[in-house]
Regions:
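N-terminal secretion targeting segments of exported proteins
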Residues: 1-21, 155
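Aromatic- and glycine-rich peptidoglycan recognition patches
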Residues: 115-155
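Secreted/periplasmic proteins that engage bacterial cell-wall peptidoglycan
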Residues: 21-111, 127
Length: 155
């Protein structure tokens, strides 16, 4: 039911080459970290995109409200909870695909995690449940498409 990969580049981006690329806007001052499931609880169903983004943000000391609901609700509900929501891509934020937007599920939408913002405005994201439940994958979203999405900064 997802058609998200219809909108990305066909080759998987290599995150290893970014290990030594730290920009001044990188607040974590750390290189790429492989995904590790947080041992704490999550209110999001395991393997879903919402679960993954919740877990991935915790790896970088960013926390997202535990009851934002389906992916396409995250931006509006996060704004009501006092989170910064912007249309400008930023590293280590949640990116929200509205229901049906850029191939996202037409009922639930989709969320992913921004690993890197490239100089040309494209973004590299990591996500779960695009290639199968609990399967973590990476892709590049071009600058034009990235500018249509909302980004949530954790607390």
């Amino acid at each position: 039911h997802y058609h998200l990969t219809d909108f990305d580049k066909k080759e998987m981006p290599s995150l290893d080459k970014y290990n030594h690329t730290i920009h001044s806007d990188d607040q974590s001052q750390s290189s790429f970290k492989p995904f590790e499931e947080n041992q704490g609880s999550s209110s999001y169903p395991q393997g879903q995109c919402t679960w993954y983004v919740d877990q991935r943000m915790k790896q970088f000391g960013q926390y997202i409200h535990s009851n934002l609901g389906d992916a396409h609700h995250w931006n509006n509900r996060a704004a009501r909870e006092g989170y910064q929501v912007s249309s400008t891509p930023k590293k280590h934020t949640a990116v929200v695909f509205e229901a049906g937007q850029l191939g996202a599920d037409t009922q639930y939408g989709h969320v992913a995690f921004v690993e890197k913002v490239n100089a040309d405005g494209s973004i590299i994201i990591s996500e779960s449940n695009v290639k199968g439940l609990g399967v973590i994958s990476y892709r590049t979203i071009d600058a034009d498409d990235a500018s249509q999405l909302d980004y949530i900064t954790g607390k």
